[in-house]
């Protein structure tokens, strides 16, 4: 007589809730870290252009410099995560976020000397970019260390919800803080958030260090490059909407472009909450193929939209499709390296989304100058289809024996 020892559905529900709580308790550091990124996002260009009196090029440089710093710091972040542990990396990142807030406070204090004020601001942006490279990847590594590798997709999905949600909340929060309290409140809030994150991380139990061979970063980068390229091609659609949707709507004489950003963000988060487990069931490549197909359809709707409501539907579909592209390719990428190199793999893989978002603005802007604003979304659709084709090729390669 056999005895069924499988857990009952309530026990399974309890186990799932426990895993989710453990993940959320760690990815909250990503939320705090990205909140420090979102708060100055909508304020700094105006501060540099209007208050310090510099041109639009420098105003844009202040924003993009942070992404460049994140890109360059990825290899170092991977070494810290793998060598010292994710908790230590989070602590370093939170300290860096607080330090960047101090540089922003200094910039406001010496506003009467525009060159010095700008220099202080630029240093702060570099420090914040380096801090971002530590916190985001470390939170994923910490979460996987706590709940186990089988839940990698769920950890990455929740981490993405935390990062995108924090930026969406931080940007309007920064505007309100400056309107109510003045420019100093922007730097002060970042200092306080960094200190809060440090204080919350300090007493938490670290994830156990995984011992083993540490591969050189360029070896890890070579292994994850095909997956990163698929991610980069998919991210062009997101970058195009985030950067140019307001100009596109204005060129068509349509109002309420901000609704597209809300629809994109809402569907992005909703899909991650509802379908994160599909990666474990179907595999990363299958999910990437489906998601990039949906994203391509959304971008095609934006390109061909006869009215703003079709454009809104296109933005929603694009957000829904892009939602699982990062974790879908990411799960397959992380599986290519030993567990002792997980941090390096996450850093190398994330580098591609930094690169994609960094070049999307000028590249898609060039396309718009040549062919008009509508053409941007056709270009992004073709890029997404390129990512889909790459996912199909990787899936076929993974099924070959040996």
Swiss-Prot record:
Q: Which keywords does UniProt give here?
A: Cell inner membrane, Cell membrane, Membrane, Transmembrane, Transmembrane helix, Transport
Q: Which domain of life is it from?
A: Bacteria
Disulfide bridge positions per record: none
Q: Does the keyword ATP-binding apply?
A: no
A Pfam family the protein falls into: MFS_1
Where does the UniProt annotation locate this protein? Cell inner membrane
One MF annotation (Gene Ontology) recorded for this entry: transmembrane transporter activity
Bilayer topology: Multi-pass membrane protein
Bilayer-crossing residues are 23-43, 52-72, 90-110, 121-141, 158-178, 180-200, 228-248, 255-275, 282-302, 309-329, 351-371, 375-395
Q: Name one GO cellular component term.
A: plasma membrane
Matching entries from CDD domains are given as: MFS_YfcJ_like
Q: Which HAMAP family match?
A: MFS_YhhS
Q: Tell me which family the UniProt entry assigns to this protein.
A: Belongs to the major facilitator superfamily. YhhS family.
What name is this protein filed under?
Uncharacterized MFS-type transporter PA1993
**Origin species:** Pseudomonas aeruginosa (strain ATCC 15692 / DSM 22644 / CIP 104116 / JCM 14847 / LMG 12228 / 1C / PRS 101 / PAO1)
């Amino acid at each position: 007589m056999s005895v069924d020892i499988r857990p009952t559905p309530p026990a399974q529900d309890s186990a799932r809730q426990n895993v989710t709580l453990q993940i959320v308790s760690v990815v909250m550091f990503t939320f705090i870290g990205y909140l420090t990124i979102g708060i100055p996002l909508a304020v700094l260009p105006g501060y540099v252009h209007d208050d310090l009196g510099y041109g639009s090029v420098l105003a844009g440089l202040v924003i993009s410099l942070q992404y460049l710093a994140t890109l360059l710091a990825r290899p170092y972040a991977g070494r810290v995560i793998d060598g010292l542990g994710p908790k230590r990396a989070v602590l370093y990142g939170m300290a860096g976020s607080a330090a960047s807030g101090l540089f922003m406070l200094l910039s406001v204090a010496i506003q009467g000397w525009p060159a010095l004020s700008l220099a202080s601001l630029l240093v702060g942006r570099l420090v914040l970019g380096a801090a971002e490279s530590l916190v985001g990847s470390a939170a994923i590594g910490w979460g996987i260390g706590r709940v186990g590798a089988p839940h990698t997709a769920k950890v990455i999905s929740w981490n993405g919800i935390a990062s995108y949600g924090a930026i969406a909340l931080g940007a309007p929060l920064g505007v309100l803080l400056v309107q109510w309290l003045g420019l100093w409140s922007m730097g002060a809030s970042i200092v306080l958030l960094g200190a809060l994150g440090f204080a919350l991380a300090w007493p938490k139990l670290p994830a156990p260090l995984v011992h083993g061979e540490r591969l050189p970063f360029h070896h890890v980068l070579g292994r994850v490059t095909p997956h990163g390229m698929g991610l980069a091609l998919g991210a062009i659609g997101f970058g195009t909407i985030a950067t140019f949707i307001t100009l596109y709507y204005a060129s068509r004489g349509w109002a309420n472009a901000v609704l597209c950003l809300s629809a994109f963000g809402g569907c992005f988060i909703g899909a991650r909450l509802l379908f994160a487990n599909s990666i474990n069931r179907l595999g990363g490549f299958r999910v990437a193929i489906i998601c990039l197909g949906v994203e391509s359809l959304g971008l095609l709707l934006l390109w061909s939209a006869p009215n703003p409501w079709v454009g809104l539907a296109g933005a929603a579909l694009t957000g829904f499709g892009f939602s699982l592209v990062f974790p879908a390719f990411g799960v397959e990428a992380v599986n290519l390296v030993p567990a002792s190199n997980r941090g390096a793999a996450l850093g190398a893989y994330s580098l591609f989304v930094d690169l994609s978002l960094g070049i999307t603005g000028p590249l898609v802007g060039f396309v718009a100058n040549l062919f008009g604003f509508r053409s941007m979304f056709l270009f992004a659709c073709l890029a997404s289809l390129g990512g889909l084709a790459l996912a199909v090729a990787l899936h076929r390669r993974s099924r070959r024996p040996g």
